[in-house]
Amino acid sequence: PYVILHGAKHGKELDVLFEKADFAVGSLARHRSGIQNIKTLKNREYAARGFGFIYSETDDDFEKMPYILKAPADETPIEISKVIAFCKKQTTPPQEIRDSIRNLSWKEQMKKVYDSI
């Protein structure tokens, strides 16, 4: 099987599943609640773990990343075959994905605050 839904998982149980995963699913269908722009912790965790992922909202920190697959922010069904094809052609190594978000660390974000005061 290509897609397995496990329900809510936390801690070590979640870590075990991440070890088996190839790709992640971020927020989808947020347009239903009127949200178009968002910065989810979920997206950042996936990148920190070295995963490519799909999401539908606008997250300026990831919009141009090569390891991202964007879904339309509407009711269009997501074609799993397109997700699988994206994963198969994905060449960004996990460490490169992790490195791409170094500027999002608490240290870097707090430096921006400190420098502005």
Task: Describe the residue ranges of each PLM region.
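Short amphipathic alpha-helix with an adjacent loop that forms part of the alpha/beta core around
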Residues: 16, 83-86
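Nucleotide-sugar-dependent
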Residues: 12-17, 24-47, 54-65
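A charged, aromatic-enriched C-terminal amphipathic alpha-helix characteristic of glycosyltransferases
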Residues: 75-78, 88-117
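A conditional alpha-helix N-cap/helix-loop micro-motif detector
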Residues: 6-7, 36, 73
